[in-house]
């Protein structure tokens, strides 16, 4: 094989030189290679003439001879020059002989072709003696690379129990050698570990070799794949690991963890409440576990049911009806666990462990008494005196068979109409009237009794419905109140009123009422219409109002009950004055007909009078308050506190907390005596101990004011009960365009003591206070 490679290399170089000679003509440089033959004839132009060839990774000493360029220019001053990216770095040329040399070992996998340009230039002038010629140096491949996998580890999965030949994964390895050279880049694969389960073809496809790959036996396989080229070259990096995971399928039956399950439950367990749990083992993965539990045999399928917990795959046994220890103390039956989604074609065999026996022991508990019926319905005719209505019966279901005591809940018999005996007999204590209550709903309690007759244990209740039957004990009466009227000049046969009757008793399907007048000697007659109504008409005509303004007619009404009852209802017929058209013009019963009596009219009049008096008082009070506000000062006249003056003078007597003398002393530096009336009145604010007054010559006025303010501030801070001095003050401000400008004391500076405020006395009584505050003090003038 190596000889063939060398021969192919020499042949390629020879053909390249021939092509160069053919294209260059007589004056173009010629490229020569080792073993080049003399050319006596022009070669065809389709030969590749501009190529040189060299083997990669040559073991000979550097530099390596690549080829030779020649020219028919025979000049002593000619030299050969190479140009290109790799000229002078990797390749060089002998300037005199034209030999092209490689100064580095070449690697075809890095660079497979080098592009160079050959020139013949003058040694002295470096001018081209011929046109430049480009040529290519191709690196011949040698089999110096082994195949390398794209990944060191491949991950794949395949369903368990797959058929033989099922594709798993395709692995890929790449050989960097020249694929055009036979055998250099051809990749071959083989499994060196795990080949008893899987196979691989020359394309790198791995497939199953056997069909019984069971995930429950081995869930994952580690396969080692090795690759080499066609010439058998392999290396360390030509090995890869393939991790093949078996995907689970539902091919296993659930198996009970026990062959027998025993549970003990109280007999009073609630229907539908879990009484036990069944556990199975299913080697399949959770998504393939769908266990279904069922009772195989026995007559208890209607007593118990088994549900599946989807999260834990457990069976939950629940009772479907109440358990009774006194009837059955133990239940035994067989159960089966199946999987409806199992893949039977992959199922090897059934182990028989998917069946088990269940035993349920019922425990006795103290149960409440049990009534023989769910409810009782008794009937009793009304007006009966303490008869036996009915009997309720309850028994102790336990083995103790204790005696039972009965009682009626007071909340169901608030009127205490009934009583019950120890034997459960129910009697009525009072006569029952169906027209008052037609039904009675009683709640009867049953308790177990100990040997002393005291209730013990649990209790049970039952509803007793007592229906009161009707008896014909109510005579018929008018269906509504009638107030008939008749004209005093009514003619004979004039209809006065049509009456009908009603009965409080249960009315039969076809009730029949009979009507009759008790006294036939009146001026009225009764005509029975035979439809449970009757007409009252004038018998003779002409009534005398002066003799009788009202006529009272007793009417007898009889029913068709057994026995028949007759009632008497009285009609009061008023005689009225009428006009010619027969319209009533005056009736004494009009006031009564309106439904308003004399007492009611008096009460209404008193209410109206009371409301009127209250309204007048409210209006008067608002008027007085409005007048009081009209005489009071507005909010703009408030200074330090609200002072209300009901008269022109004397208002300053209320300002005990506002010491006017202090302000005057500041202005004049003298002490103004307090009025005796101010000392007699109690102070509104906390009394402040003032500092001793200093003469104006010893201390300035404004300084004394500052001291006074500090003292008041300190005492106000220490007095938790007194009102604060730093409250909001509202001052009236007349404006800069007025004569007095601002009246606020805050706008007064310390140098206003020379201002004459006597003009305030001319402003009237409302400014008297300001005139006294800012007016000159005679004592100050004396001191000055």
From Swiss-Prot:
Signal peptide stretch: 1-24
Annotated effect of mutating residue 774 to A: No effect on PARD3 binding
Residue ranges crossing the lipid bilayer per the database entry: 600-620
Result for mutant: residue 777 to A: Impairs PARD3 binding
PROSITE patterns: CADHERIN_1, CADHERIN_2
Keyword annotations of the record: Calcium, Cell adhesion, Cell junction, Cell membrane, Cleavage on pair of basic residues, Cytoplasm, Glycoprotein, Membrane, Metal-binding, Phosphoprotein, Repeat, Signal, Transmembrane, Transmembrane helix
InterPro entries: Cadherin, Cadherin-like_dom, Cadherin-like_sf, Cadherin_CS, Cadherin_Y-type_LIR, Catenin-bd_sf
Proregion residues excised on maturation: 25-45
Extracellular-side positions: 46-599
Required for interaction with PALS1: region residues: 621-660
Cytoplasmic topological domain residue ranges: 621-784
Molecular functions per Gene Ontology: beta-catenin binding; BMP receptor binding; calcium ion binding; cell-cell adhesion mediator activity; fibrinogen binding; protein phosphatase binding; protein tyrosine kinase binding; signaling receptor complex adaptor activity
Membrane-topology descriptor: Single-pass type I membrane protein
Free-text tissue specificity from the UniProt record: Expressed in postnatal endothelial cells of the retinal vascular plexus (at protein level).
A Gene Ontology term for the protein's cellular component: nucleoplasm
Binding site for Ca(2+) 1: 56-57, 107, 109, 144
Chain positions recorded as Ca(2+) 2 binding sites: 56, 109, 141-142, 144, 177
Subunit structure: Part of a complex composed of AMOTL2, MAGI1 and CDH5, within the complex AMOTL2 acts as a scaffold protein for the interaction of MAGI1 with CDH5. The complex is required for coupling actin fibers to cell junctions in endothelial cells. Within the complex AMOTL2 (via its N-terminus) interacts with CDH5. Interacts (via cadherin 5 domain) with PTPRB. Interacts with TRPC4. Interacts with KRIT1. Interacts with PARD3. Interacts with RTN4 (isoform B).
Protein name: Cadherin-5
Native source organism of the sequence: Mus musculus
Gene: Cdh5
């Amino acid at each position: 094989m190596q000889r063939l490679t060398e021969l192919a290399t020499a042949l390629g170089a020879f053909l390249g030189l021939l092509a160069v000679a053919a294209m260059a003509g007589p004056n173009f440089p010629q490229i020569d290679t080792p073993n080049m033959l003399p050319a006596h004839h022009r070669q065809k132009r389709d030969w590749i003439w501009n190529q040189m060839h060299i083997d990669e990774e040559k073991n000979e000493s550097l530099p390596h001879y690549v080829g030779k360029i020649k020219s028919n220019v025979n000049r002593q001053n000619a030299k050969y020059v190479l140009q290109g990216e790799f000229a002078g770095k990797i390749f060089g040329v002998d300037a005199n002989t034209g030999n092209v040399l490689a100064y580095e070992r070449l690697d075809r996998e890095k660079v497979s072709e080098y592009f160079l340009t050959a020139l013949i230039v003058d040694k002295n002038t470096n001018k081209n003696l011929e046109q430049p010629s480009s040529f290519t140096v191709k690196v011949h491949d040698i089999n110096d690379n082994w195949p390398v996998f794209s990944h060191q580890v491949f991950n794949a999965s395949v369903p368990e129990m797959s058929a033989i030949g099922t594709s798993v994964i395709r692995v890929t390895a790449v050989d960097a050698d020249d694929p055009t050279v036979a055998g250099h880049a051809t990749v071959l694969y083989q499994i060196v570990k795990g080949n008893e389960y899987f196979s691989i073809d020359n394309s790198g496809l791995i497939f199953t070799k056997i069909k019984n790959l069971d995930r429950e036996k081995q869930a994952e396989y580690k396969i080692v794949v090795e690759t080499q080229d066609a010439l058998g070259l392999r290396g360390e990096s030509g090995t890869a690991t393939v991790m093949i995971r078996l995907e689970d399928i539902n091919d296993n039956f659930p198996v009970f963890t026990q062959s027998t399950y025993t549970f003990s439950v109280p007999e009073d367990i609630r229907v539908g409440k879990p009484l036990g749990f069944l556990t199975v083992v299913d080697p399949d993965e959770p998504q393939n576990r769908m266990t279904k539990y069922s009772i195989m045999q026995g007559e208890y399928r209607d007593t118990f049911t088994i549900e599946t917990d989807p999260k834990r795959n457990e069976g939950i046994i629940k009772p479907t009806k109440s358990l009774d220890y006194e009837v059955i103390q133990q239940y035994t039956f067989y159960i089966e666990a199946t999987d409806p989604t199992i893949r039977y074609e992959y199922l090897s065999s059934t182990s028989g462990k998917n069946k088990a026996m269940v035993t349920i022991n019922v425990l006795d508990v103290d149960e409440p008494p049990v009534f023989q019926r769910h409810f009782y319905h008794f009937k009793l005719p009304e007006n009966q005196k303490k008869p036996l209505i009915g009997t309720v019966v309850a028994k102790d279901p336990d083995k103790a068979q204790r005696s039972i005591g009965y009682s009626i809940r007071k909340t169901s018999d608030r009127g205490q109409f009934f009583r019950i005996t120890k034997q459960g007999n129910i009697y009525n204590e009072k006569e029952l009237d169906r027209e008052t209550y037609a039904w009675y709903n009683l709640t009867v309690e049953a308790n177990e009794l100990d040997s002393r007759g005291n209730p013990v244990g649990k209790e049970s209740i039952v509803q007793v419905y007592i229906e009161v039957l009707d008896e014909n004990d109510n005579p018929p009466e008018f269906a509504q109140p009638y107030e008939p009227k008749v004209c005093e000049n009514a003619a004979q046969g004039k209809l006065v009123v049509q009456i009908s009757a009603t009965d409080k008793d249960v009315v039969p399907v076809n009730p029949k009422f009979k009507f009759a007048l008790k006294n036939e000697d009146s001026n009225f007659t009764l005509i029975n219409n035979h439809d449970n109504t009757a007409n009252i008409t004038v018998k003779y005509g002409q009534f005398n109002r002066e003799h009788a303004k009202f006529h009272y007619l007793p009417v007898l009404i009889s029913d068709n009950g057994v026995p028949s009852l007759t009632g008497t209802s009285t009609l009061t017929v008023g005689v009225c004055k009428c006009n010619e058209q027969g319209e009533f013009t005056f009736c004494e019963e009009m006031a009564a007909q309106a439904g308003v009596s004399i007492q009611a009219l008096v009460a209404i009049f008193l209410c109206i009078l009371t409301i009127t008096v209250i309204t007048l008082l409210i209006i008067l009070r608002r008027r007085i308050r409005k007048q009081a506000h009209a005489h009071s000062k507005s909010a703009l006249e408030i200074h330090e506190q609200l002072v209300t003056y009901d008269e022109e003078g004397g208002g300053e007597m209320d300002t005990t907390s506002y010491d006017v003398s202090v302000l005057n002393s500041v202005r004049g530096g003298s002490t103004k005596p307090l009025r005796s009336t101010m000392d007699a009145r109690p102070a509104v604010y906390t009394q402040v101990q003032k500092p001793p007054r200093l003469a104006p010559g010893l201390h300035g006025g404004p300084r004394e004011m500052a001291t006074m303010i500090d003292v008041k501030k300190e005492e106000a801070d220490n007095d938790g009960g007194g009102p604060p001095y730093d409250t909001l003050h509202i001052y009236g401000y007349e404006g800069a365009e007025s004569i007095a400008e601002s009246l606020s004391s805050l706008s007064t500076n310390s140098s206003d003591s020379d201002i004459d405020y006597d003009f305030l006395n001319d402003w009237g009584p409302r400014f008297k206070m300001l005139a006294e505050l800012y007016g000159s003090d005679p004592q100050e003038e004396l001191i000055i």
